[in-house]
Amino acid sequence: TSISAGVENRTNYTYLTNIGQSYTVDNSTLPTYNVKARQFDGSIQVLSANLQQNFKLGPLHWDNDITWQVSSNKEILPLPQLNIFTDLYFKFLYAKRLEIEAGANMTCFTKYSAPTYSPATGMFHLQNNSKIQEVGGYPLINAYANFRIQGVRFYVMYYHANNNLLKNTDSFFVPGYPLNPSMVKFGLSWTFFD
């Protein structure tokens, strides 16, 4: 078990914001992007607390990480109030050589008006106040299996396993960019020894 808490004081906080306005063409409202750097003259305090608790019962593991945080100025430094990561898996040795870890993990955070991504700059900026899109409140669940034998590691993951289970259109972690649909991912890492 690990518990931590803290207060961070940020002075002269620099951020990007979109000061562009929307315009109408052929009955369609289109946004303009005018991203500018700004500096907040005052100070912003961030209060946070974190709890990490891991359970183990034989080969069954359950790892949890919960973070609570609040910003004194949510318009300039928006943060989700609660972040949750949980990982439930079996970890065991097969035939005294092959390490196997199989389970599922979930990431979820409370809704908030997250910074949006600007492809032109490759950076995140605050959303335009004329149209705020909140993200969060949606669990992202992945099922996976990891295998390791000596210097070889292999994994297979079913990413966004709950995509077809929940009829929810709020599957965004970044405004305007939906999460990828369910997919299977593979990976291989092979360490060669000299």
Predicted regions and their residues:
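Exposed, low-structure sequence patches enriched in small/polar residues
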Residues: 1-194
